[in-house]
């Protein structure tokens, strides 16, 4: 099955935040209580109830100050560390290439929040008494795209800053857009996400270096995820297996001891 991808063309984004609203509306997420912090960003970060948001960045180049806007959320890495460390398989690579999330399977361990190179997943405490928690992240509206629809944010974008299609088609379009921008004076225009971490599910056409948007120049698969995948997780399976074997052996040993201690009573015989 062809991999589907989102293209974020920052040169077309007007920071209207329609994508933020559409996301909350589709997922029936409540508004967040915020305070004025001196920035146009609202809220200031991703939250359990804010899966998509527009980031604002001031960038100075050639003596000129520019506003850079970015539609931000999960980038759906092909080499997704969050998927590799999830012990309950709540996070999976969908056949269409994006990272799906099943909230009902999440045990709130928070491993995904520790290994994401882009610091995307958020952990929400559901029950303070029991400590129950659940993770959250953008799923590309998995219920929509698996039924042939666009993500809600893409559907509502009026400028074409957000686009949705097969990955190869969007890569071709994004590269052509970068060339067009360079021909119009955007010397630092570039494509971000083609090869990073196996290829991101959210491609970006940038008009400035990635760092200007708060993006890592060279995101890397985290060492912690490698340790978990290659050492701790296999050890956990072995430990679980040994525990199960031990319980079975213990049951038989206990049962044998119980049978050995049963007093044999011969009918008709009295002490």
What are these regions (language model features)?
Residues 1-271:
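Non-ligating segments of multi-cofactor redox enzymes
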